[in-house]
Amino acid sequence: EIRFCDWSSDVCSSDLSPRTDWLTDPAEASGYIVLGMGKYGARELNYSSDIDLIVFFDPEKARPTGGLDPSTFFVRITRDLVKLMTERTPEGYVFRTDLRLRPDPGATQIALSVDAALQYYETVGQNWERAAYIKARAVAGDIAAGEAFLRELSPYIWRKYLDYAAIADIHAMKRQIHAHKGHARIAIEGHNLKLGRGGIREIEFFVQTQQLIAGGRQSDLRVPETLTALDRLEARGWISPPTAAEMAEAYPFLRSIEHRLQMLDDEQTHSLPSRPEKFEQIARFSGYENGAALAKAVRQRLETVQTHYAALFEDVPALSRSAAPGSLVFTGDSDDPETVKTLAEMGFSSPSSVIGKIGRAHV
């Protein structure tokens, strides 16, 4: 993994120092907090990954001189930082960067004050946001302030008791995953290893759901890494040794195939090829004699994951076909046309608004 934390601090320093005389070392006790989320936070990045960041600031720690508003200043710094990472040059780019996991991204600035963030999470924070913070870590800027923020947020993430509404919300997250287009069955050619049935997201949700339920009372379950969490869930008796072993074997297997898919054409993809010649190519690249051998290995893992995942939610009703007659996809940078159509058929007058609000649940 690229030493983004050190690099980002250097960028912040070089960007801030020429503009101000109020802070000599912006990477030290500046109150500027950059949290890494998702696979970046858990040190589980793909070969071709976006990185998910949330940026906060503590105005009490860093007060710009000259009457400059702290919010304006830190928004500007964040915008410049993201531009440096995402801008394509002859040498390429550093990372595609996504800031949309912050509180209410459609209505808030890209850098929020710590107080505003805490108030949001304490009053209207959602369970999907609690799940997202399982993998959060301070990665740049004022690391000590970032770690202090996560400690303060800990009671929100790790509740000692879950009420029925919270558990129902977790079940709703599961149903939404199953509503994803292409999730109805296991298909090999064209199967999405991340979002499809038996895929990577099911393993991660299998783990995170049980962490949310038990982590408030058992602090050793509060770990960001998927494989470490599986080990600890087994040790605590939440899952059986065979289940832990099979899920722990399937996760790196599926991730390794995902990496190779992204290496093949240097693009961000999670789906196995539909064309036979491309499938043979990825099979050989993955160390298999032919496509049939790879297909057999992939199907075995997908079916294993599907079995364990379904057992965890065996009493959860499926999303009603009458309520959702078509596709429901809430990921991606643009609205899925089939999802817009489905929501319109369900009676929503503004499908794009609905997609924007629900899309933050996919982390």
Segments and roles (model prediction):
Residues E60-A62, G125-W128, F205, L227, ...:
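Polyanionic (Asp/Glu-rich) segments that form extended negatively charged tracts
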Residues E1-C12, A361:
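Single conserved hydrophobic/aromatic residue that forms the stacking wall/gate
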Residues S9, S14-S17, M85, T89-Y93, ...:
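Long, hydrophobic, amphipathic alpha-helical segments used as structural scaffolds
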Residues P103-Q109, V114-I200, I213, L302:
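Long, amphipathic alpha-helical stalk/connector segments used for oligomerization, subunit docking
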Residues G31-Y32, M37-Y40, Y161-R236, A248-Q262, ...:
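Core structural elements
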Residues S17-Y32, V94-I110, A172-R175, K194-G198, ...:
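A glycine-rich phosphate-binding loop feature that marks nucleotide/adenosyl-phosphate handling sites
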Residues I33-L35, Y40-L68, I203:
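Catalytic metal-binding acidic patch
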Residues C12-L35, P64-T123:
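Conserved catalytic core of two-metal-ion nucleotidyltransferases
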